[in-house]
Amino acid sequence: MTGERPVHLTAIIGSFGGAVENLGAAHGIYAFAVPPEQIVEFCRFLKEHPALEFDFLSDICGVDHYPETPRFETVYHLYSLKNKWRVRIKCRLGEPPHVPTVTGVWRTANWHEREAWDMYGIRFEGHPDLRRIYMWEGFEGFPQRKDFPLRGYKDKLNPFGAEGPPPTQPDLATNDIPQGGR
């Protein structure tokens, strides 16, 4: 995807003008930044446009950019089975992080969005069943956030949680690695 701009990229930029920011391409995957309020419309356009047909939602990832602002981001990876094209959509979110659900565009978004909710606390507005998928109901916090305690929170299931100093770590920069032996 070098040289002349591909037809599908021209269609994307032409249809959304200044609302969609072209982030360029890496490894043949074009990336776009889309405001949260336009994510559903943009995704539906990518799926339904006859020249594009991004019919496969590979995944949705949550990203925590702490301490940057905006802190959170959702990243959508799409694939067109017909055209064999990939595209990445990035959506920066304020706090508390929330974005409309794309389950009305791709049903598989259901599980991907539940995972981003469970790990990062990103709320997908309009999701049909937004509940934890890995952690148990009643779990406090979101374990993939950068401010989540590395040892977890202290509770009955984790009596050695956040209180107390962290375990000592070897200093890899000085090769101060403890030597095991027999």
From Swiss-Prot:
Keyword Cell membrane: yes
EC assignment: 7.1.1.-
Signal peptide from the UniProt entry: none
Keywords, comma-separated and alphabetical: Cell inner membrane, Cell membrane, Membrane, NAD, Plasmid, Quinone, Translocase, Transport, Ubiquinone
A Gene Ontology cellular-component term: plasma membrane
Spans traversing the lipid bilayer: none
Keyword Mitochondrion: no
Catalytic activity: a quinone + NADH + 5 H(+)(in) = a quinol + NAD(+) + 4 H(+)(out)
Domain of life: Bacteria
Cited Pfam families: Complex1_30kDa
InterPro entries: NADH_DH_suC (IPR010218), NADH_quin_OxRdtase_su_C/D-like (IPR037232), NADH_UbQ_OxRdtase_30kDa_su (IPR001268), NADH_UbQ_OxRdtase_CS (IPR020396)
PROSITE patterns listed in its UniProt record: COMPLEX1_30K (PS00542)
Classification via SUPFAM superfamilies: Nqo5-like (SSF143243)
Membrane topology: Peripheral membrane protein
UniProt-annotated location(s): Cell inner membrane
GO molecular function terms attached to this record: NADH dehydrogenase (ubiquinone) activity; NADH:ubiquinone reductase (non-electrogenic) activity; quinone binding
Positions of region (Disordered): 153-182
Self-association state and partner proteins as the record states: NDH-1 is composed of 14 different subunits. Subunits NuoB, C, D, E, F, and G constitute the peripheral sector of the complex.
Role: NDH-1 shuttles electrons from NADH, via FMN and iron-sulfur (Fe-S) centers, to quinones in the respiratory chain. The immediate electron acceptor for the enzyme in this species is believed to be ubiquinone. Couples the redox reaction to proton translocation (for every two electrons transferred, four hydrogen ions are translocated across the cytoplasmic membrane), and thus conserves the redox energy in a proton gradient.
Family: Belongs to the complex I 30 kDa subunit family.
Name listed for the protein in its UniProt record: NADH-quinone oxidoreductase subunit C 2
Organism of this sequence: Rhizobium meliloti (strain 1021)
